[in-house]
Curated annotation (Swiss-Prot):
This is Inactive dipeptidyl peptidase 10. The chain crosses the membrane at residues 35-55. It holds the Pfam family Peptidase_S9. It comes from Mus musculus. One of its GO terms (molecular function) is serine-type peptidase activity. Belongs to the peptidase S9B family. DPPIV subfamily. The keyword Phosphoprotein applies. InterPro entries: AB_hydrolase_fold (IPR029058), Peptidase_S9_cat (IPR001375), Peptidase_S9B_N (IPR002469), Serine_Prot_S9B/DPPIV (IPR050278).
Length: 797
């Protein structure tokens, strides 16, 4: 540095030149090359310092010029597809999973060695889109011509494929060719097969045996054996499967659902024929006749014998649902019975050899009972079982926590011991290890927005340990898990906040793991995109602490003003503000239109205790709207929110809440878009509407107050987009038709986008148009208004 402060050698040389030297002299000038080099070096150092200063003082997001904005085409492309390896435990040391390339592999958990079971070309050859491996790993069921029916159910044709020989044959009922089945799957032992055709159950002891029809009462649209009708699939079981294997494969429990008194809903199909066709299916609306249900157990070995398991006496003269069935031994099942108002639940333990059932636990509520699908976890001898129950935690109300039930043999008396407590929720019990006397579960103890895997001792001091808290803790705070049959290993599913990964762990030493899927393609794609930054805040509303999540544009600056989009949840009891990885159509809007997206879990949302959840009892539509408006009022106090550019979006129940907010007296929103909106709870499913509002015959005023159609004049000031598929079997197009009829009568302008013959979930072929419609609507509505100055008249020359 001292050299920089001195005159350069070159300067001294110039000054020492002879004074009488002529300017035009031919003699070469005397140059100091060493001095010139030093001068250039100094200039280079100074330039480097300036460049470094610019880089250090420039925000990171501005320096990474390789980042590009996210487009809808990219979002729907392969680069943004998360791969689910669909891992399944075969036994304690074998996991079967599917690679990103479509190969089906077998992983040995002791050696971490993978073996190819099924090449991806097999799926191409047979045009199969679904598969299922036999328990002995010798055969695979391949489903082709798959057609979705409702949310979970589908029909398909099936092939049985020999993995080792390549031999293949069709799976058909006796004397039927080219059959379309409602369900087909392997049993729990060897090559047992079960399939459902025309609402009847068929059984094969192995792939070479003849099929045995287990039921004969099945009738399309009326009697459902082993498979759910719409109501049970969508609102009660949350699955289309309504049958359950005993652990040894010798017995099968199944529901017989009778819809003979249930009114039918008609869904027209407008395209593809000269005259529209229609399909109808039983759909009980609020207050209408419900399906009746019976539970049977059939013995599969020896002469087939079918036995009915009877409901508790209290339900024999009442309407009831069956919400959970589970085998706890080779001969005993545990069953949950729920009354129609959904405020009385009884858990019974049934002996399948005699049909005798004993009551083990009863729950009642002044509102409604949640978590009625939860399966209790039993010890091997059945002397104890574990289940989550609501436990009061001071002024915060009740939270779901683990209780251990000690069963008295040949008696209905039980002893209860609570294993966890606190202002947090146990999400699900995963396993009980009798050797270590530990219970494994997921909970929100670390954060209401996260999910961590914990263990707790069931004896002594009930010590609790977080197993997942230190695993990839910068990237993963939201987990799910699955334990092997003997609990020696577990699969850990990291679902966010960073790109999801799936790993295999040893239970005794969880820090040792094998990475099953890291979604590397998605990670590489994400790194090249200017995706939103998320931030969670806690709002205090009516003595509640409620979470608000904001997604900011990557180059967000607080001095600027931004438009706001508020997104509603699709279901009551859900959770919008989580640590789960999220990239969706709203990510495109944030990136391309510099919009801030807000999600808020107000009263009526889940996983924050029953007090928050059940505030909407008999008040659905009003409490949620009030809290969302309170969140908007908070946001309007922030200097970066443009009060003239506010919008709202919701689908299904979320569309219902968005509509209730838009028609309220609070006029914040410039526009709103609703997809398949529920407009009147009387038109919606019985189990849903009655859970929150009761029976319409007794709660007429409550139903009227909860209807969007009531006092609809409030929608006059907003720009409203309604989107609906005409073949929606969940929220019928009838809801939008009634809404539009009332809008026209009230003189309200609206925009309607209809998707002919599309359901609640828009198909892949229409998805680009669907998202484009929503994005274009919000882009036009939320664009910044530029003030145009009046032009001064030009002066005449």
């Amino acid at each position: 540095m001292k050299q920089e402060q001195q005159p350069t050698p070159g300067a001294r040389a110039t000054q020492s030149q002879p004074a009488d030297q002529e300017l035009g002299s031919n003699s070469p000038p005397q140059r100091n090359w060493k001095g010139i080099a030093i001068a250039l070096l100094v200039i280079l150092v100074v330039c480097s310092l300036i460049t470094m200063s610019v880089i250090l003082l420039t925000p990171d997001e501005l320096t990474n010029s390789s980042e590009t904005r996210l487009s809808l085409e990219e979002l729907l492309g392969k680069g943004f597809g998360l791969h689910n390896p669909e891992p399944r435990w075969i036994n304690d040391t074998v996991v079967v999973y599917k690679t990103n390339n479509g190969h089906v592999m077998k992983l040995n958990t002791e050696s971490n060695a993978s073996t190819l079971l099924l090449d991806n070309s097999t799926f191409v050859t047979f045009k199969a889109s679904r598969h299922s491996l036999s328990p002995d790993l010798k055969y695979v069921l391949l489903a082709y011509d798959v057609k979705q029916i409702f949310h979970y159910s589908f029909t398909a044709s099936y092939l049985i494929y020999n993995i080792h020989t390549g031999e293949v044959w069709e799976l058909n009922p006796p004397e039927v060719e080219d059959s379309v089945l409602q369900y087909a799957a392997w049993g729990v032992q060897g090559q047992q097969l079960i399939y459902i055709f025309e609402n009847n159950i068929y059984y094969q002891p192995d792939i070479k045996s003849s099929s045995l029809r287990l039921t004969s009462s099945g009738k399309e649209g009326i009697i459902f054996n082993g498979i759910a009708d719409w109501l049970y699939e969508e609102e009660l079981l949350h699955s289309h499967i309504a049958h359950w294997w005993s652990p040894d494969g010798e017995r099968l429990a199944f529901l017989m659902i009778n819809d003979s008194l249930v009114p039918n809903m008609i869904i027209p199909r407008f395209t593809g024929a000269l005259y529209p066709k229609a399909k109808q299916y039983p759909y009980p609306k609020a207050g209408q006749a419900n399906p009746s249900v019976k539970l049977y157990v059939v013995n599969l070995y020896g002469p087939t014998h079918t036995l009915e398991l009877m409901p508790p006496d209290i339900f024999k003269s009442r309407e009831y649902y069956i919400t959970m069935v589970k085998w706890v031994s080779n001969t005993r099942t545990v069953v949950r019975w729920l009354n129609r108002p959904q405020n009385i639940s009884i858990l019974t333990l049934c002996e399948s050899t005699t049909g005798a059932c004993s009551r083990k636990y009863e729950m009642t509520s002044d509102t409604w009972l949640s978590k009625q699908n939860e399966e209790p976890v039993f010890s091997r001898d059945g002397s104890k079982f574990f289940m989550t129950v609501p436990v009061k935690q001071g002024g915060r109300g009740e939270f779901h926590h683990i209780a251990m039930f000690l069963v008295q043999s040949k008696s209905e008396q039980i002893t209860v011991r609570h294993l966890t407590s606190g202002n947090w929720e146990v999400i699900r019990i995963l396993a009980y290890d009798e050797t270590t006397q530990k219970i494994y579960f997921l909970s929100t103890e670390s954060s209401p927005q996260g999910r961590q895997l914990y263990s707790a001792s069931t004896e002594g001091l009930l010590n609790r340990d977080c197993i997942s808290c230190n695993f990839m803790k910068e990237d993963c705070t939201y987990f799910d898990a699955s334990f092997s049959p003997m609990n020696q290993h577990f699969l850990l599913f990291c679902e966010g906040p960073k790109v999801p990964v799936v790993s295999l762990h040893i239970t005794d030493n969880p820090s040792r793991y094998f990475l099953l899927e890291n979604n590397s393609v998605m990670k590489e794609t994400i790194q090249k995109k200017k995706l939103a930054k998320r931030e969670t805040r806690i709002l205090h509303i009516d003595d509640y602490e409620l979470p608000l999540q904001l997604s900011f544009p990557k180059d967000f600056m607080e001095k600027n003003q931004y438009a706001l989009l508020l997104i509603m949840d699709e279901e009551p009891g859900g959770q919008m503000v989580t640590d789960k990885f999220h990239v969706d159509w709203d990510s495109v809007l944030i990136d391309t239109d510099n919009v801030i997206v807000a999600r808020f879990d107000g009263r009526g949302s889940g996983f924050q205790g029953l007090k928050v959840l059940q505030e909407i009892h008999r008040r659905i539509g009003s409490v949620e709207a009030k809290d969302q408006v309170a969140a908007v009022k908070y946001l309007l106090k922030q200097p970066y929110i443009d009060s003239k550019r506010l919008s709202i979006f919701g689908k299904g129940y979320g569309g219902y809440i968005a509509s209730m907010i838009l028609k309220s007296d609070e006029k914040f929103f410039k526009c709103g878009a609703v997809v398949a909106p529920i407009s009147d709870m009387k038109l919606y499913a019985s189990a849903f509407s009655e859970r929150y509002l009761g029976m319409p015959s007794k709660e007429e005023s409550t139903y009227q107050a909860s209807s969007v159609l009531h006092n609809i004049h409030g929608l006059k000031e907003e720009n409203l987009l309604i989107i609906h598929g005409t073949a929606d079997t969940k929220v019928h197009f009838q809801h939008s038709a009634e809404l539009i009829k009332h809008l026209i009568k009230a003189g309200v302008n609206y925009t309607l986008q209809v998707y002919p013959d599309e359901g609640y979930h828009i198909s892949d072929k229409s998805k680009h148009h669907f998202y484009s419609t929503i994005l274009r609507f919000f882009s036009d509505c939320l664009k910044e208004e530029v003030s145009v100055l009046p032009q001064e008249p030009e002066e005449d020359e």
